[in-house]
């Protein structure tokens, strides 16, 4: 029993556990990040700095002491907050400003002042996008299956599906040897020119979210066996990175002329506003005829927007439960989700080694893997849809946006009451 002066220890939630994993990786990389709790979002002083023990659920993480501003607004913003230093002209249209030396002790307080004087959304945090908090994508930690298990859903019977189509996967990279170990991954390429493969996981234990990008590539390839798939290691900080760095990677990816970009990461945002760097990037993406961005809808079990999936023009994907007839309990939902696809209990390529669970209720549990895993989340419904788009492109000659539009129209005709538009493997009308 605690004494009268002590507080009983509050249980760590899954959301908090995931946030801590990401924070630790950023700390090791020398990048300061702050928490924005779910309660009192946007209020001065409500953020919890890295290293503080907080009981609040984490709404989102952002870089401490920097903001994102449109190029045309830089002078106006500097007029409000003082001598903010230009850290980086990130891409054409977006500038990163440092708050060091200004009068604002926190990023949120600076943004509140900018909101009051210039309007909400002129400047935004430099959000952390991740495959974990907030939005928890994947929805579960990987589960053991035999090393010789078949992928589920299985490989499409027509091995020519996806021929001539390039799917780009900005994620945790491709595990060394995975393409040789699994026939359906043959020819899948790493996207990074330097250090193309992430470090192989040590046998005991492997790092968090190891194999996420490989699993995603496997799901996409099962739907489109002949598609060219490139997996980039961009979410290199325990499955996360800054919005600014991810956008830089996506700009570089456009040089490859992809047909489909499959992004299984995202974030909540301050006031639910669109993340500024993605807003500018998507305007640029429209100049690349036919390229479609498919993004995970997140796993909060919530109807609020999850970005970048919630942008108009992005194919946002929610998850169906294991029976394919209802929405998965973890999946986000709402009018901004375009389509639901199988996302619970999928089986595909993974790492080999020992994994130690980090999240309640299984924290501390050790699991042994032999190249395959069962995993759940909108993270994995997303490449299923990306693969179906690629497969349709190879059959019809449509570009990525045209194929996505046609599949979404079909998905609405087979909507499930109380769920929404649905896409399942093998149901594309163009096959008939």
Segment roles from a protein language model:
Residues 2-131:
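Inhibitory N-terminal propeptides of secreted protease zymogens
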Residues 4, 235-311, 366-383, 417-420:
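Substrate-binding/access-modulating region of protease and related hydrolase catalytic domains
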Residues 88-98, 103-166, 178-181, 367, ...:
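Protease zymogen maturation seam
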Residues 140-227, 248-256, 260, 354-358, ...:
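Active-site core segment of subtilase-fold serine proteases
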Residues 220-240, 398-411:
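Short helix-loop-beta-strand segments that form the rim/entrance of peptidase-like active sites
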Residues 258-266, 275-277, 394-432:
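C-terminal subdomain of the subtilisin-like protease fold in secreted/lumenal serine endopeptidases
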């Amino acid at each position: 029993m605690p004494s009268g002066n002590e507080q009983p220890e509050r249980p760590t939630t899954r959301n908090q556990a995931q946030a801590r994993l990401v924070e630790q990786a950023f700390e090791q990389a020398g990048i300061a990040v702050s928490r924005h709790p779910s309660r009192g979002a946007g209020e001065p002083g409500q953020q919890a700095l890295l290293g503080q023990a907080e009981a609040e659920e984490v709404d989102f993480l952002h870089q401490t002491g920097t903001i994102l501003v449109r190029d045309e607004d830089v002078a106006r913003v500097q007029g409000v907050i003082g001598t903010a230093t230009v850290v980086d002209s990130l891409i054409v249209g977006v500038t990163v400003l440092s708050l060091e030396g200004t009068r604002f002790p926190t990023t949120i307080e600076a943004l509140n002042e900018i909101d009051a004087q210039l309007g909400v959304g002129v400047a935004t945090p430099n959000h952390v996008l991740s495959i974990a908090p907030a939005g928890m994508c994947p929805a579960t930690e990987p589960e053991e299956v035999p090393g010789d298990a078949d992928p589920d859903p299985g490989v499409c019977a027509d091995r020519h599906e996806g021929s001539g189509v390039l799917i780009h996967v900005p994620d945790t990279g491709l595990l060394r040897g995975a393409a040789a170990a699994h026939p359906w991954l043959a020819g899948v390429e790493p996207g990074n020119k330097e250090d193309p493969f992430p470090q192989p996981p040590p046998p005991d234990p492997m790092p968090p979210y190891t194999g996420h990008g490989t699993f995603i590539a496997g799901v996409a390839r099962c739907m489109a066996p002949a598609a060219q798939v490139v997996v980039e290691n961009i979410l290199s900080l325990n499955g996360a990175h800054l919005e600014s760095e991810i956008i830089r990677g996506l700009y570089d990816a456009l040089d490859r002329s992809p047909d489909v970009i499959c992004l299984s990461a995202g974030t909540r945002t301050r006031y639910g506003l669109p993340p500024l760097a993605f807003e500018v990037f998507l305007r640029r993406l429209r100049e690349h005829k036919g390229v479609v961005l498919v993004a995970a809808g997140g796993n909060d079990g919530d109807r609020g927007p999850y970005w970048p999936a919630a942008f108009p023009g992005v194919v946002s994907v929610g998850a169906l439960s294991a029976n394919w007839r209802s929405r998965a309990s973890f999946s986000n939902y709402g009018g901004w989700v375009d389509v639901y696809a199988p996302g619970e209990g999928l089986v595909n390529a993974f790492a080999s080694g020992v994994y130690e669970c980090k999240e309640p209720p299984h924290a501390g549990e050790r699991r042994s893997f032999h190249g395959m895993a069962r995993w759940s989340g909108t993270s994995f419904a997303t490449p299923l849809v990306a693969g179906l788009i690629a497969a349709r492109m190879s059959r019809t000659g449509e570009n990525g946006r045209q194929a996505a539009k046609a599949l979404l129209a079909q998905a609405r005709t087979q909507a499930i009451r109380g769920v929404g538009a649905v896409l399942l493997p093998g149901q594309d009308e163009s096959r008939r």
